[in-house]
Regions:
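Conserved mixed alpha/beta catalytic, RNA-binding, or beta-rich assembly cores of soluble enzyme
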Residues: 10-102
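Extended amphipathic alpha-helical scaffolds
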Residues: 1-11
Length: 102
């Protein structure tokens, strides 16, 4: 049996009461998994899969390419996409963000 290397976690929270939002970022080797949830009914509403790449206009700068999946009726894309793209570009890591806030 292979021994698993423990992943590193970073946790954060912001807001109060029903407006409180939580996030956990977990390093998985060279990649990053981000979970964002909060409100009265935490859930999985949208998933953003983001990869850093050289910008087409300024190759010395990092940009990103994303694919997003939204579960029917959910509008969490803006949170998942924004967080994944900013983190992927800043950290130069493939990033998957899962978001669900009600």
């Amino acid at each position: 049996m292979h021994r698993l290397k423990q992943a590193s976690n970073i946790q954060a929270a912001s807001g109060r009461g029903r407006h409180r939002v939580y996030a956990i970022a977990q390093l998985l080797g060279d990649d990053l998994l981000l979970s964002i949830w909060g409100g009265a009914l935490p859930h999985i509403g949208s998933v953003s899969i983001t990869q850093p790449r050289a910008s087409g206009q300024a190759p010395e700068r990092l940009s990103t390419t994303s694919s997003v999946y939204n579960f029917y009726g959910h509008k969490d894309e803006s949170v998942a996409r924004l967080c994944a793209e900013r983190i992927a570009a800043a950290c130069n890591k493939k990033t998957v963000a899962v978001a669900g806030i009600h």
